[in-house]
Each structure stands twice: as structure tokens, then as C-alpha cells.
Design a protein with these regions (language model features):
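Amphipathic alpha-helical binding modules
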Residues: 469-470, 474-495
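A short, small-residue-rich loop immediately preceding and capping a beta-strand
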Residues: 348-352, 446, 503-517, 532-535
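Flexible loop/turn segments at secondary-structure boundaries
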Residues: 6-8, 30-32, 61-62, 208-209, ...
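Ferredoxin-type iron-sulfur electron-transfer modules and their immediate structural context
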Residues: 90, 103-264, 271-349, 354-445, ...
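Active-site cofactor/cluster-binding pocket
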Residues: 1-161, 232, 236, 556-560
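Acidic, Ser/Thr-rich peripheral helices and adjacent loops at domain boundaries
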Residues: 21, 31-46, 292-308, 368-379, ...
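Short acidic, glycine/serine/threonine-rich loops at helix termini
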Residues: 11-12, 33-38, 64-67, 129, ...
Length: 612
């Protein structure tokens, strides 16, 4: 039913018995079908006498007013071809069911479904299978995957077979390097699933460069970039580039809105939020040239720090460190999580409750959380459903204890008489800012650099006459570095350098966890007065398990386990937390107020204590 299953090479046809029927829902003529079908699919179809049909339910659904809902058309086509019951009976039964289901929505909706049923029974076309398909040969794979070697290896050995629904073919040895459950960040960028039939196209002349489209995008597939003249000059031919129209960067940079058609889910959220209709949905195939533009901007265009700030517009020039997740098209949960990573992602820990946010956030081998060009990104972990808050608190306390020990070592280093002045200055700057995440970032980097520069090698020690004999003794023992107090402490600090920068600790979960099953732990954690941030994706039902009512569901709300409407009011988690008197509490909805959402997230991180 989705043409991307064919273009990605899923082994869909291999389950059809010889002489069976295989129908593809697509907008292609025969030449395009011949181009998109993989060689193994062609061979199977030809050698097993498969009856091949195509149907363009995509355009038919749009023409009759059903939008993306083409399932009724396809169901009718199925019954027409499968002959599991007389076609006339199948059409009659479907129409009776459509009337029973949709009459309350009006006769127009019923008639629309009738039309879809009638069209589906006649709109398919039989494809004459060429004899040469029996000997079709795959073109050689000339792709060169770029990135961290460990990540590329994981993508080739695990992600690609799993992505083609061929994971059962993997030997146990393929997971030898992942036995502890750790997977490399950023694998989702290699999927390029191409599942959207329609994707947005950008009108550069209409655009007012507000970046609201990128702000709401759940999948980080539409991103603004500020380009230097050189970067603009080297951009692919398909790039649409204009001058920055107002505010920061005007007269300095050029602007483009890069869209990734192969990562886009086609939800249309960006279209709905654009205040000047500068975006419109068009068929994906016509926009594939924009993929090169997106890839170029991500890989070659530098981040412009002077364009970034904690405003709706400025925040979107920051790299999202959650991208191309497997969440449902238009899912708002990922919009919020992505925004948090843009603000704090390079020094962020995440403890994630089981639920929707752990499914899109941590699927094995396809992590959508990613790192920046320096290799820094969110560290993500998932424990059990009910103990996520305690797990997150443990992550915070653990790294906080390590940092307190590092602070004590740093004070000892400063006290060493012969330690270099520039090292002492860097150490003091780190100590002075160690509890402020944003202010601590640069001092932490500078401290690491000063530590690396300060350690004296045995060869350097030997060059100093009064230490030559001691250097010879160290060399005889196989030592590489000086063993004085300053060098010893510096080496130990460097061995734990990933803990030097102040971490932004976030605890993610849904309302089923926060209001119900994990509430006891959440209450315990906010009562601890520790500096952690808790973000609840309140969907007002247990989303991942099928929409069951939770204590976050509203009175009268119809949900699973509340078919007649929930009889009690929504639990006020915010008011409960406020009774402690020292918990930062905020409710946010980016669709209602983008600025307030940003402000609340920034305030939560800045507050030295628990935030909800």
C-alpha cells in the first residue's frame, strides 16, 4: 500500500505463492515501475507466474476528498482480485459497513466511502510481466557510507538487514559488540525510508524566515540554515537561497530552508503552522533533488553561533539532536523532545520511561538521538516502566558524585606549586562555573585542553638536565608520562573528562508513567530536591498500549477502559508538585504558545532543583 516498500527493496512479494496476485499502490507508469522494482522482486514475479497489478489509490483518494485515507479503495480492490467471496457481496457488505460507521458524520461522508468502494473495484491495472524479468540482475551498490567507523559498521551489519525486514537472517555474532545494549548514536540518519507520498516544498520568496515550521516539525526534516557567501556558492544547483531578510545575520549571511524528502513523514504540520503559506505539499518524487541540498547543509554548512538564541527563530539554527525518529507522522512528543535537545543536547542525560517515547527514542540499532560534529550528544537510557524517575535520579547522583570528586582533585591540582599558571587559571574557571550548565561548557573544554597540554612526557622530562636521571628510571619501567603530582592528577582528571561538563539531566515519560504507574517514584524524586528535570508527554491516555484511560484522562473522555466516558476528573499533577514549595512547575503547549514553551524549558534547566 506504500510505494516506499518497493523502492526500499522490502521482500514483500516473496510471501506470494506461485500463481498468486501481487498489487502495488503507486503513481507509476510501467517505465517507472520497471525502474523502481528491485531485481530480486522481478525475478520472483517472473519465475513464479505472479499476477502483477498496480492501482493509484493515492491520487484517487485525494480526488474524491478522502485525503491520505486510501484504505477503503485498496480493500475494495483486494476483494475484487482475491475472489474470497463473490465481488457483488463484498461490495454490498462494505457499503453496509460504511453506512453503519459513518452515517453519524453525514450522508456526504457515506457517499464518499461508497465512491471509494466502487473505484477500488475497477481502478486497478494488470501489468504484463516481461520475460526478461526472470533473469533481472541487481545493479552494484556503489554507495559510500560516511560517518564514524563504528556507526557505519553497525549500519551495514545490523541496521540495513533489519530495515529490509531481513533481521531474522542475522547471526548472533552480528551483535557481539552490542552485548551490553549500547548502540551508536545517529543511526536513523542512514535509513532514508522515503515513506511520505507528499512532502513540503518551500517558496523562498513568500517565506518570512520565522522558522516556525522547523520549530514544530516532529522529525527534524525541515531545517533553516544561515550560509556564508562561500557556502552558498558551493551549494547544489537545486538549492533555493535568499538573503537573510531581517534581524541577526542581515547583510552577513544568506538563508535556505532545507527539506529532507526521504526522511519526511508527510504529516503536514509545517504547512499548517506557516503564517504566509510559504510551504505546500507536492509529490515526493518531484522533490528528490532537495535531498542533496539537505545533505549538503547538514554536512558542509557551519553552525552560526551569532544566529542562535533561545527564541523561536534563533533556537532553530541550533542542531537538533533528535532526528528522523520512528514516531507516528505528526507526533507532538518528538517535537518537544527535539526542542530540548536543541537547547541542551550536547551535555544532556536522558532517562526514559517505557512507552511511546522509548519506542521512538531507543529502537535497537536505529537511534534517532545523534551527536554533533565534536561527537557530543545526549546519553539515553531506558529502565523499567515504573522506576524511571528513580533511575534518572540515580544517573544524576552518580555523575554528581564523580564531579564532586573531580572538583576535589582539581583543588589539589591548583595547590601544586609547580603546576602551570595557565592550567591553574583554567582549573579555577571550571570550578567557578561547575554548577551552571550553560556557563560551564566552554570552561570545561578549556580545562580539558589545558590538562592535555600540561602533562609532561618522559622524553620531555629527559630534556631537562636535573630530571634526566628520573626520566631514565621511568622509561625503564615503561612509563610514558611524568609521575609528579601535577601530571598524575591531570592524567586522572583526563581519564574522566566526559564528566567535567555540567550535565543537563532529563527524565522523559508519558502520563501512564507519571500520573499512574510511576507516580510514587516521581513524587519521591521531586521531594529529593535534586537538580533534575522531568518532562511528561501528557497525551491523556496510555498511548503506546492502545489508548487506555489514565489519571491524566479528562472527565467524560471516551477511551479504552472508559467506553462510557471517564467518571472522575483529571489528576492535577502540577498542583500536587507545587505543594512542595521548591519544585519548578510549568505546563506547555507549543501549538498554543511557542515562546512560553521555550521560556519554561529554559527556566526548568536554569533552576537548581527539581523541575516538572
Amino acid at each position: 500500500h506504500n510505494p516506499s516498500y518497493v523502492t526500499k527493496g522490502y521482500k514483500m512479494v516473496n510471501d506470494v505463492k506461485p500463481g498468486g496476485v501481487f498489487m502495488i499502490n503507486c503513481q507509476w507508469d510501467f517505465e517507472e515501475l520497471n525502474h523502481h522494482l528491485k531485481a530480486d522482486a522481478k525475478r520472483y514475479i517472473a519465475r513464479n507466474n505472479i499476477q502483477l497489478y498496480t492501482i493509484n489509490a493515492i491520487d484517487l483518494a485525494i480526488e474524491i476528498g478522502m485525503g491520505k485515507r486510501n484504505n477503503t479503495i485498496l480493500q475494495s480492490a483486494f476483494f475484487s482480485l482475491a475472489k474470497v467471496l463473490p465481488e457483488e457481496d463484498a461490495i454490498r457488505f462494505m457499503k453496509e459497513k460504511a453506512k453503519a460507521s459513518y452515517l453519524k458524520k453525514g450522508q456526504d461522508v457515506v457517499d464518499m466511502n461508497y465512491k471509494a468502494i466502487d473505484l477500488g473495484a475497477t481502478a486497478y491495472k494488470k501489468i504484463d510481466v516481461p520475460a526478461e524479468w526472470a533473469d533481472a540482475v541487481d545493479e552494484p551498490d556503489t554507495r559510500e557510507l560516511k560517518g564514524k567507523p563504528e556507526l557505519v559498521k553497525m549500519v551495514k551489519e545490523i541496521l540495513e538487514p533489519v530495515g529490509k525486514m531481513d533481521g531474522d537472517s542475522l547471526p548472533v555474532s552480528a551483535f557481539a559488540e552490542h552485548v551490553d545494549g549500547q548502540f551508536e548514536l545517529g543511526a536513523s540518519a542512514y535509513e532514508k525510508r522515503g515513506v511520505a507520498v507528499s512532502v513540503p516544498t518551500w517558496d523562498a520568496n513568500k517565506c518570512i524566515q520565522c522558522n516556525q515550521c522547523a520549530y514544530v516539525c516532529p522529525h527534524a526534516t525541515i531545517r533553516p540554515f544561515a550560509l556564508t557567501a562561500e557556502e552558498a556558492k558551493n551549494a547544489p544547483e537545486a538549492a533555493k537561497i535568499v538573503d537573510v531578510k531581517a534581524g541577526k545575520g542581515k547583510g552577513t549571511y544568506q538563508f535556505t530552508m532545507a527539506i529532507s524528502p526521504l526522511d519526511c513523514m508527510g504529516c503536514g504540520v509545517c504547512i499548517g503552522v506557516c503564517p504566509v503559506n510559504a510551504l505546500s505539499m507536492v509529490p515526493q518524487e518531484g522533490e528528490l533533488a532537495q535531498q542533496d541540498v539537505f545533505n549538503y547543509c547538514v554536512a558542509e554548512v557551519s553552525e552560526k553561533k551569532d544566529m542562535q538564541d533561545n527564541t523561536v527563530k534563533g533556537s532553530q539554527f541550533k542542531q537538533p539532536m533528535l532526528e528522523f525518529s520512528g514516531s507516528c507522522a505528526g507526533c507532538a512528543e518528538t517535537s518537544y523532545a527535539r526542542l530540548v535537545t536543541q537547547l541542551f543536547g550536547d551535555h544532556m542525560y536522558i532517562s526514559n520511561a517505557t512507552g511511546c517515547s522509548s519506542i521512538w527514542g531507543g529502537p535497537a540499532a536505529t537511534s534517532p538521538y545523534c551527536a554533533n560534529k565534536e561527537g557530543h550528544g545526549p546519553a539515553w537510557c531506558n529502565s523499567l516502566f515504573e522506576d524511571n524517575a528513580e533511575h534518572g535520579l540515580g544517573m544524576y547522583i552518580g555523575q554528581n558524585k564523580i564531579r564532586q570528586d573531580l572538583a576535589e582533585e582539581t583543588r589539589q591540582l591548583i595547590a601544586v606549586e609547580w603546576a602551570r599558571p595557565e592550567l591553574k587559571a583554567a582549573a579555577q574557571a571550571w570550578l567557578d562555573t561547575m554548577e551552571d550548565g550553560e556557563a560551564n561548557a566552554e570552561p570545561a573544554k578549556a580545562f580539558v585542553k589545558a590538562l592535555e597540554d600540561s602533562i609532561c612526557t618522559v622524553d620531555e622530562l629527559a630534556a631537562v638536565p636535573q630530571f634526566a636521571e628520573h626520566a631514565a628510571e621511568l622509561k625503564a619501567k615503561g612509563a610514558l608520562f611524568c609521575d609528579c603530582a601535577a601530571c598524575t592528577i591531570a592524567a586522572d582528571l583526563l581519564s574522566k573528562k566526559e564528566y567535567l561538563a555540567k550535565k543537563s539531566m532529563w527524565i522523559f515519560g508519558g502520563d501512564g508513567w507519571a500520573y499512574d504507574i510511576g507516580y510514587g517514584g516521581l513524587d519521591h524524586v521531586i521531594a529529593s530536591k535534586q537538580d533534575v528535570n522531568i518532562f511528561v508527554f501528557d497525551t491523556e491516555v496510555y498511548s503506546n498500549t492502545g489508548g487506555q484511560a489514565s489519571k491524566a484522562s479528562n472527565i467524560g473522555q471516551v477511551a479504552q477502559f472508559a467506553a462510557a466516558g471517564k467518571t472522575i476528573a483529571k489528576k492535577s499533577l502540577a498542583e500536587i508538585a507545587m505543594t512542595y514549595g521548591y519544585v519548578y512547575v510549568a505546563q506547555v503547549a507549543m501549538g498554543a504558545n511557542m515562546n512560553q514553551t521555550l521560556k519554561a524549558i529554559a527556566e526548568a534547566e536554569a533552576y537548581h532543583g527539581p523541575s516538572l
